[in-house]
Amino acid sequence: MGVASPLPNTYSAFFGDAAPPTVAAAVADRPLVSPCQSSASNGRRMAKICSISLLVVLSLSILNASASGEQQKKVRQKREWIIPPRKLRENVNYMYLDYIAKIRSDEETRTSIRYSLKGAGADQPPRDLFTVGSTDGKVKINGLLDREKTPVYYLQGVAKFLNGSNAEKDVDLRVVVLDENDCPPVFNLTIGAVSELSARDTLVMSITATDADEEGTLHTKIAYSIVEQSHAEMFYINRETGGIYVMHNTLDREKIDSYTLTVKGTDMNGAPGGNSGTGKVVINILDVNDNVPTLEKNIYECRVEENTRFVEVVRIQAIDADLIYTDNWLAVFTLVSGNEAGYFSITTDKKTNEGILMLNKELDYEELKEIRLQVSVSNKAHYHSSVVITGSKTYTIQVSVINQPEAPRFKPAVKVITISEESTTVILNKVITNYAAIDSDTMLIATNVRYAKGQDVDNWLIIDEKTADIRLNKIPDYESVFLKNYTYYAHILCITNETPAKTATGTIAIQVKDFNDHCPVLIHQSQKLCYEEHVVFVTAEDKDHFPNAHPFGFKVNTKHTKESWSVEHFNDTAAIFRSQETLWPGVYHLSVDVWDQQGKVCGAQLLRVEVCMCGAEKVCLPVTVVSRFGGSGVLLMLLGLLLLLLIPLLLLFCLCGAAGAAGDFKAIPFDAKEHLIAYNTEGQGEDKGMALLHMSKDENTRTNVGTVGGAQKQSDGKDGAVTAGGSHWSTFYHYDQFNNNAYHHHRDRTDGDFMYAQRKDEHSRFENYNAFDGLALSDAFLGNYYSQKSSHVAQKQALGDNLKVYEYEGQESRAGSFEDICSLMHEEEDLAFLDNLDMKFKTLAEICSGSTIQRESINVSSKKTESKDLSVQETSNILQSQEKKSSTILAGSVNQSSNMQQTSQEKKTSTIIAGSINQSSSLQHASTGVYLQEQVMLPNTTLLVQQPALYYAPAAPVYVVEPHPTVLVASGQVLGHQENQKRPKNAKHETHYQSLVYVEQQQPLRESQGSISGAVHMVNTEIMQSTEGHGVRREIRPARRVMMEEVREREVDSLHLRVPMSL
């Protein structure tokens, strides 16, 4: 697609410019081919015609080149015209033309094409200024162009098929608007300024007019001129630059303060026919200090009262023609003469430009009745160079003083008195002077007045109220701190008796003459002297002054000085004391006489000289204090040794051991004290939903298990009947009998879950502690204390009621026997326990019986035995996926399987306390490693038990017993312990009874897994344990039978138990 001018494409393509209209009309419809490109069939004859035609066309093109300069050149490139900018003049009517340009597509030879334009001036504002024929592609203009609004129009020609698709790529059409001189120059209001009295050719300002025509052409080249001036011609303008200059140096702001000029600008550089424009220029005249200020009058008269000050005397107005409120206008007043005493001052009021005369000091009518002042005036700014001042003009101000009634006054204002400080020449209460005031008007002594002291800091003076006689109240002191330059000042007041009263003030100055009333004294009473040195500088001072002070004389009083010293003069106030021999380190005292210039001495003075060892700096070295062991220290040491010897003797009178001190045991108050009779509570209500707590199998978890006596056989690790169960980690046991099986199942589901979770947490925390962490007391003390504590707890629990066991109907278990319940009901009313009360009731019993009750004690012997530590691994009731295992360790004969190995054999020292139970509290914190036990009184029955081994350990309790085949127990009530645990299904349950052995200081042993089964031999004591409020309660009662019966399976938490085993 191409864009064509009104000329044929043939000529545009070949020559770049439009052909003449005649030629264009002739070849408008010819194809874009040269005549030289005709077929070869024309022959040579046609060649000559072609050559002639080409020469004619070429000649016409060259001749018409200047006329066709406004036509756009077109270059055909493939199927698209690239058109240089097309130029149209503004304000020219091109609407009569058939078209100003033409666009065509080569596709129109094959099909119908629709042409359109887009861009500013076509489909954008200003809309429809340019239009195109939809079928012929002719571009027309529909209005006049304005270059000042749009200098160039950027259009795009569009060719589309009838279906709306593009037939060609859009072609750019740029229309350039040529400028015409249609805009006149425009001026803006311009304001300039110049100082008055400026010299000729002084540049005031430059003005510039604007022209909207095309820049850089004659259409915008402006020539300036002044058309009119408001006053006389004082300025001229540069024709080309527009600069305005001063024509005459007679500008005077006081006459004309501004000028208004009318300036003209013509484009085309002022040529005829150019456009012109005018504007206004305002020039302000700036002020300079070319006027000297003056006053309204030459002489001013005023009056002022005496004895007044800081009052305004008169105002004088300054006149200045310069610009108001500027430094050229502001006046400066100067007192030239008449104010030598400084009575007056003059200032300027900046608002009114007035001079204000002020009175600063009081005037005395009797001394000065009239003052004549000379004043000059000038400006704050410097005068202009045109101002010539030959001499300063002065103005006169006449001031008259008005007499006023005055108060009396002291004359002189300061009265000086000279007095010696020598007490023999001063007589107190004697008149030393009279200081009466005078009348200011008559100059005679004032009457109708009274006198008083105004200021007397040291109370030296006494004044007579009526006569003004001055007396001394104390002896003057030349060394007094109240003296200033050896003069004491006091103020005397004279007060009139009229109303209002008037006051006059006078000053008494007492000059004190020095008297030699002080002796010279040593400044430093103590001096230090380095060893092997001999010189000490001694300095004295005297409060008196010359000639009653220095120079001083020094002398050593040999009568009171042991060492030999000589004195040398150093200066007027100091002397050199030289030792005649070398002094050893120590303190020496010298008696020194010192006298002043007048020979006054007040007795010998003591000088302390300390001789010490010195370093390189000649400074005494610090003295090392040596402590010696004196007699008092020896006595204290002997007393301490005697006390150490006395303490073992006192211990002989103390009761030691658990049996002997059972009644005097004082438990550490960790728990609240209980009452004598403790009542049990019923089991908790029905709890249908209990979540199972699963615990993974861990081979590294520590577990302690208590053991009871009996016979057992260890299996090979598979399921078997369990004779007795162990507890997980702590000594928390479950009592399980046929008649109370269901009840304890309910208790385990409530309190047991809580207890297990707490034991699990204690166990995990205990893993981080060593065997002796947290242990602060000795092993002997702890062992004794635990033994007494356990005995006390056992006895205290024995006094309570027995636990009543009921069937828990919510569990599908077989009903047990109620025989034990009936027996317990009879035992509840049994008050036989009151016959064997604790020792704390001993005093009450003695009061009631009226006699002294003797305590019974049992001596228990012990012997060293060898024991083997046995540890067994037990795993109980791992739900669905773990094997059901349980194990326990029983004191008695033990048959071990082949998978258990002997790890160590150690000799242990063990002791059994007959009749007492040492049990570990499972609720103690595992990290402390300390378990408190209480002490109980033993019953009167006798208990014989074959002695096992006893071990102490600060860790969790582990019950280890040496294998003894036989346990012998005497008849009667025996304290024991039972251990019970939930067991898997089809497990055998049996209860074993035996005295409890408390083990402490268990050594870490190797571990082995295994399960133990066997039979247990019953003895005549059984233990029942229950949980109340998350605590452990045990009951002890006589046994009735051996309970061998199948135990129902309980749904309890999966527990993993580890029991240390030693072979």
Curated annotation (Swiss-Prot):
GO terms for cellular component: desmosome; plasma membrane. Residues 1-632 are extracellular. GO terms for biological process: cell-cell adhesion; cell-cell junction organization; homophilic cell adhesion via plasma membrane adhesion molecules; morphogenesis of an epithelium. Pfam families: CADH_Y-type_LIR (PF01049), Cadherin (PF00028). SMART domains: CA. The chain crosses the membrane at residues 633-653. The keyword Glycoprotein applies. Glycans are attached at residues 163, 188, 485, 571. Residues 106-187, 194-295, 296-410, 411-522 form the Cadherin domain. GO terms for molecular function: calcium ion binding. InterPro entries: Cadherin-domain_protein, Cadherin-like_dom, Cadherin-like_sf, Cadherin_CS, Cadherin_Y-type_LIR, Catenin-bd_sf, Desmosomal_cadherin. It is found in: Cell junction, Desmosome; Cell membrane. Residues 654-1063 are cytoplasmic. It is a multi-pass membrane protein. Keywords: Calcium, Cell adhesion, Cell junction, Cell membrane, Glycoprotein, Membrane, Metal-binding, Repeat, Transmembrane, Transmembrane helix. PANTHER family: DESMOGLEIN FAMILY MEMBER (PTHR24025), DESMOGLEIN-2 (PTHR24025:SF1). Three calcium ions are usually bound at the interface of each cadherin domain and rigidify the connections, imparting a strong curvature to the full-length ectodomain. A component of desmosome cell-cell junctions which are required for positive regulation of cellular adhesion. Involved in the interaction of plaque proteins and intermediate filaments mediating cell-cell adhesion. This is Desmoglein-2-like protein. It comes from Danio rerio.
